[in-house]
Amino acid sequence: MKRPSGRAADQLRSIRITRNYTKHAEGSVLVEFGDTKVICTVSVENGVPRFLKGQGQGWLTAEYGMLPRATGERNQREASRGKQGGRTLEIQRLIGRSLRAALDMSKLGDLTLYVDCDVIQADGGTRTASITGAMVALVDALKVIKKRGGLKGGDPLKQMIGAVSVGMYQGEPVLDLDYLEDSAAETDLNVVMTSTGGFIEVQGTAEGAPFQPEELNAMLELAKKGMNEIFELQKAALAD
C-alpha cells in the first residue's frame, strides 16, 4: 500500500499551530494539518443561557463553517441559503461536546465561551483539526479571563482535548487522512481523545465493506499513537 502523500501508514501530516492569530478574540489560533487550514477563535461573554441561569456554572458552545472556496469548487454560503446544513450542525455539536469535556463548568463562573471554527482551506480532517486548534485557543482564552480577575473558583481546565482521523485505506489502517485518502477509504474514523488517554467520541463509517473488530482495534491504536504526538504539539505551541 502506498499513500498518495507518500507518508507512512502511521505518519501524521505536517501540523502547525499558530497562536494569537487574530487580535480581537480572547483566544485565537490558525491550525494547519497539511493543506487543511482552520482559524479557531474563542470569545468570552458575560452571562449564560437561560437553561443554566442560577446554577452556578458557565457554558461553552461552538460554531463551524467553511469559506465558499475552501474546497476545489465554490460552495454557496450557508447564510445565503438561509439555513445551516446537516453536516455543519453535526460538526459544530461535536466540537462543542469535545471542548466541554476539557472544562469543569462550575469553576468557569457566569460566563459563556463561544468557539468559532472557520475552515479557510479544506483537504480532509477539518473537524479534527478544528477541535485540536480550538483547544489551544481555549487555553489562551482562560488565561485572559484569569488576567481580568475571573476564575476565582480555581482553574476550570481539567485536561487537554485533541482529535485525529484514521481509516482503512487499501486494506490497511492509516493515520490522519487527507481528502484523496478519505474519499477512497473503505472506513473512515474520527477519534476525539483526552490527554489522559480517554475517548470523548469515536465516529466511524464503513464506506465499502464492513470493518472487522480487529481492524477497529488497529485503527484505535493508531489514533492513540497520533494523539500522543498531537498533545505534544499542543504543549509545545502553548510553551512559546
Curated annotation (Swiss-Prot):
PANTHER family linked: EXOSOME COMPLEX COMPONENT, EXOSOME COMPLEX COMPONENT RRP41
Matches recorded under SUPFAM superfamilies: Ribonuclease PH domain 2-like (SSF55666), Ribosomal protein S5 domain 2-like (SSF54211)
Catalytic class of the enzyme: transferase
Alphabetical list of PROSITE patterns matching this protein: RIBONUCLEASE_PH
Keyword Lyase set for record: no
The protein's assembly and partners: Homohexameric ring arranged as a trimer of dimers.
Reaction(s) catalysed by this chain's protein: tRNA(n+1) + phosphate = tRNA(n) + a ribonucleoside 5'-diphosphate
A Pfam family recorded for this sequence: RNase_PH
Enzyme Commission number(s) of this protein: 2.7.7.56
A biological-process GO annotation: tRNA processing
Residues binding phosphate: 87, 125-127
Source species: Pseudomonas fluorescens (strain Pf0-1)
Source taxon at top rank: Bacteria
Family: Belongs to the RNase PH family.
One function term, GO molecular function aspect: tRNA nucleotidyltransferase activity
Transmembrane region(s): none
CDD domains: RNase_PH_bact
Keywords for this protein: Nucleotidyltransferase, RNA-binding, rRNA processing, Transferase, tRNA processing, tRNA-binding
Name under which the protein is recorded: Ribonuclease PH
Summary of the function given for this chain in its UniProt record: Phosphorolytic 3'-5' exoribonuclease that plays an important role in tRNA 3'-end maturation. Removes nucleotide residues following the 3'-CCA terminus of tRNAs; can also add nucleotides to the ends of RNA molecules by using nucleoside diphosphates as substrates, but this may not be physiologically important. Probably plays a role in initiation of 16S rRNA degradation (leading to ribosome degradation) during starvation.
InterPro entries on file: ExoRNase_PH_dom1, ExoRNase_PH_dom2, ExoRNase_PH_dom2_sf, PNPase/RNase_PH_dom_sf, Ribosomal_Su5_D2-typ_SF, RNase_PH, RNase_PH_bac-type, RNase_PH_CS
